[in-house]
Regions:
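Basic/polar low-complexity intrinsically disordered segments
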Residues: 1-113
């Protein structure tokens, strides 16, 4: 069964893609890598905890006198702002990566026919 007939990328296309990836790597150089152990130990923000976190940040900013001095509300707000800003980029990259992997699989499958 042929799923994918052709994908034609020129040398110029490959060069432009490599340049674009280099730009992304440069602009996203502050992204971190975590080990499997670190990943397991991190708190994960799911849908319910995200709502709770957002509401808590609002409550903390509205009631600064109730917050312990060692809690940096401004830093938490900056983290949430960066979380929000990064999310749409991750969604686009994830979708693009999925399409690239599907195309790679289809090309390999077609080549085996």
């Amino acid at each position: 069964m042929v799923i994918f007939s052709t994908l034609t990328l020129t040398e110029a296309d490959h060069a432009a893609i490599a340049d674009a990836l280099s730009t992304l790597e440069s602009k996203l150089s502050a992204l971190i890598s975590v080990s499997a152990d670190q990943r397991r130990s991190l708190n994960k923000m799911g849908e319910k905890s995200e709502t709770f976190c957002r509401r808590t940040l609002v409550a903390m900013s509205e009631n600064p006198g109730l917050i312990p001095a060692d809690v940096d509300v401004a830093e938490a707000q900056r983290d949430m702002a960066q979380f929000d800003a990064l999310r749409p980029h991750i969604a686009r990259l994830t979708k693009l990566l999925g399409r690239a992997e599907d195309s790679e699989m289809a090309l390999g499958s077609d080549a085996m026919v």
